């Protein structure tokens, strides 16, 4: 969130108005205004691009990648993840039931154990 952008990008209210389906292209075209680490602006670009890296590296969407590594181990049977044009939206949009969210929260509180 501190990598130099002037304003939030890929935010929920903005996404329906993008004319370009390639959100990686949109994200990489955003100019940097500040030096990285010097200015905080909440945005979805960094987490979105991190999700893209996982998807490209392993050749599958985020749910397919994380199910055997995380979700099934936590007993989360059918997670749903919001999609963007062309891929999963790694910056947000993970839909879990309340009990699944509880399991995830306990996993986090127990530092991955």
What are these regions (language model features)?
Residues 81-89, 111-113:
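A beta-strand-loop signature enriched in Asp, Gly, Thr, and Trp
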Residues 1-76, 98-102, 106-112:
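Active-site-adjacent helix/loop patches that line small-molecule binding or acyl-intermediate pockets
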Residues 86-99:
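Carbohydrate-binding/catalytic loop surfaces
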